[in-house]
């Protein structure tokens, strides 16, 4: 049998804990029973003005060098909702996320896109768990549901963020406003069939 060097796919070791493993097993059993069209996955990720490609081409034996801002760069946060056929409620904020800014996002951007019967799926970040967030989602006739801990593989929006960051690194935007404009342009790079593929890759049935 031939072998070759292969990039590792890394998972959190905590997934092997009995309590986490049980919750993940229950979740996976639930996945096949829910209509993917009802699922709305929301999350946030950082974007920065010092992003650059992580890989490139160089002559064998030569180091590949690149320049990025060292002391003058900004961190912003991108939030969005992934449905089976589209990205909904995209938003960028200046700086890191906190409870107040996440609630404002839910109330002002997410809730207007929700329909009765929608299931809003989130990870276990503290800002996601407030009663105010629950009540805002409930006001639209939707429900809030938390993923098992240490389970980004069960959240298809993580695939969106991975592709988005790859494209942003290639863009090398160095001001906040150019970064935000570029994010808006790149959202067109996620057509309905690709969103459906992200769902299937994470185990959420046929769409």
In which residue ranges do the predicted regions lie?
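Short functional hotspots at interaction and active-site rims
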Residues: 1-207
